[in-house]
């Protein structure tokens, strides 16, 4: 196994590799300015297109390419397995273009890793949100009724390995099997770290402060289902938010 950090500009040497896992993508957890949107696209769509061209001239047999559950858009209470259509909005279009940027020979087994919010002791998402809750100002976002696709870091990694080692192809939802609404998630975090969560961030305030990131990232509802992994026999170690929180806080 070889780890390579690549900005997508110069050519990449894939000699000797039979499989590639591409996890590139600039973090989207802040206000989406035009400058940042350009970075989002460059680090996802453009880099993936360049990688695809390199794979064409290589002996790579498997490509696992990052994507995100944002591809489904804001869908209310609709269940969203991998066969669900893409949604609308900037984030959904970005994710669709990201996946479409993969143009490799038909004999290259390709998997699109549609990942939700990754939770783990060292994950970026947990690092940012845990501070807010520990300060005693954590709370639900907007109405709190929006479904929040999430996954424990352990299952994120093991799920990727599972896709690599099994004949899985196409989109794969890397999310926990138990969906949670934002209000339920907030309650579980507060209970785990022994903090009350009386506050609620109003939707209008979040939109004013964070713009489209609030609208499409924090307040959008996506009840994503990991149907492909479940059908293939993957067993989640952390299927519930309560079990995930217990492990994270314990460590």
Regions of interest found by a model, annotated:
Residues 130-138, 145-180:
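Alpha-helical substrate-binding/gating segment
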Residues 86-89, 116-123, 143-153:
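Glycine-rich "substrate-gating" loop/helix at the edge of Rossmann-like oxidoreductase active sites
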Residues 20, 153-160, 174, 185, ...:
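Non-catalytic, hydrophobic alpha-helical segments
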Residues 216-251:
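C-terminal amphipathic/interface module of NAD(P)-dependent oxidoreductases
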Residues 159, 166-212, 246-251:
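Mid/C-terminal beta-alpha module of Rossmann-like enzyme folds, strongest
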Residues 1-50:
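NAD(P)H-binding glycine-rich loop region in Rossmannoid oxidoreductase-like domains
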Residues 49-89:
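Conserved Rossmann-fold NAD(P)-dependent oxidoreductase catalytic core, especially the SDR/UDP-sugar
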Residues 67-68, 100-121:
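Conserved beta-loop-beta element that borders a ligand/cofactor-binding pocket
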